[in-house]
């Protein structure tokens, strides 16, 4: 299939304000808008159409029904050819009651930025929301990657790249480990930290929970290959797809980091 949304690479500059507003010592839990894509190929729906009705129904109920223990939902509303697929995934530290506020923000953000689009994705710090007329369960989306990075460089670029990549790689293994379960469900998320010289790097990786563990690993390996483009020597960086993403910073940006990763020797 050809690109549904087209691919995009955002230059570092966009992230400057976002990344420079943090200090090492304070945990500021932001939920900044990051990016969106309106699908051109899926077209627009008409006012009063069955698609609109289905979309309105699913978006009006999405934050009020069900539980948010895994911060994820993939749901379908209506019947072919007017069915709507909606997926959201909250960040791994933003489940339960932390999740619905981000989704509400994302719903209004998506409606404002992609009015009447049948397909659209919006990214925030703490969640992702996607609507589509095309099913995507357990399919890696390779078409909508983008990255954000802090324009400032580390002095020891080589060491920093090597050690940060190694941390992310380790987290990718952990996130996609089939034995890394929350009850019976795959966790598909991992966070950790690591000392590099005098600095400490904080990092996370995550997949959307429609993926099976092998696909999660495949997705993460795909975006980790973009580390050189995104993140070469940068003091902070993130690569996003729709199906997975990673982030690292020199300050803590999550509500908590897992103990096992923190204690692991490097
Ligand atoms: C963190 O957030 C607090 C409250 O919103 C703000 O006063 C403070 O300046 C922020 N710190 C940084 C480093 O942005
Ligand atoms: C973060 O901490 C809370 C409460 O201690 C816990 O319920 C939650 O599972 C933790 N999240 C992660 C990702 O470890
Ligand atoms: C970081 O390094 C790159 C590549 O060497 C350079 O183009 C860029 O200007 C540097 N950024 C800063 C803020 O010095
Ligand atoms: C994580 O580490 C903290 C501090 O070392 C400890 O108090 C806490 O019980 C640990 N949590 C788990 C789930 O092991």
UniProtKB/Swiss-Prot annotation:
The keyword Repeat applies. Residues 1-26 form the signal peptide. It comes from the Eukaryota. One of its GO terms (cellular component) is extracellular region. Residues 33-136, 142-253 form the Gnk2-homologous domain. Keywords: Repeat, Secreted, Signal. It holds the Pfam family Stress-antifung. It is found in: Secreted. Belongs to the cysteine-rich repeat secretory protein family. PANTHER family: CYSTEINE-RICH REPEAT SECRETORY PROTEIN 29-RELATED, CYSTEINE-RICH REPEAT SECRETORY PROTEIN 38-RELATED. This is Cysteine-rich repeat secretory protein 41. The gene is CRRSP41.
């Amino acid at each position: 299939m050809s690109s549904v949304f087209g691919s995009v690479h955002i230059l570092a500059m966009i992230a400057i304000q976002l990344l420079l507003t943090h200090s090492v010592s304070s945990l500021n839990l932001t939920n900044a808008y990051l990016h969106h894509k309106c699908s051109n190929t899926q077209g627009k729906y008409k006012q009063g159409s069955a698609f609109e009705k289905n979309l309105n129904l699913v978006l009006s109920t999405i934050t009020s029904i069900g539980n948010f223990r895994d911060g994820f939902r993939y749901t379908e509303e209506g019947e072919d050819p007017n069915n709507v697929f909606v997926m959201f995934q909250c960040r791994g530290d933003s489940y339960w009651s932390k999740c619905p506020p981000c989704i509400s923000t994302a719903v209004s953000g998506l409606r404002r930025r992609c009015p009447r689009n049948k397909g659209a994705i919006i990214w925030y710090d703490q969640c992702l929301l996607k609507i589509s007329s095309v099913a995507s369960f357990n399919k890696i989306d390779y078409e909508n990657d983008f990255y954000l990075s802090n324009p400032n460089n580390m002095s020891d670029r080589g060491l920093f790249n090597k050690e940060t990549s190694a941390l992310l790689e380790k987290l990718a293994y952990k996130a996609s480990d089939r034995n890394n379960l929350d009850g019976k469900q795959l966790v598909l998320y991992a966070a950790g930290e690591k000392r590099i010289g005098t600095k400490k790097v904080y990092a996370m990786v995550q997949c959307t929970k429609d993926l099976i563990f092998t696909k999660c690993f495949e997705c993460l390996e795909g975006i980790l290959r973009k580390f050189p483009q995104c993140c070469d020597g940068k003091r902070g960086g993130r690569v996003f797809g729709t199906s997975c993403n990673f982030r690292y910073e020199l300050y803590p940006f999550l509500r908590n980091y897992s103990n096992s990763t923190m204690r692991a020797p490097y």
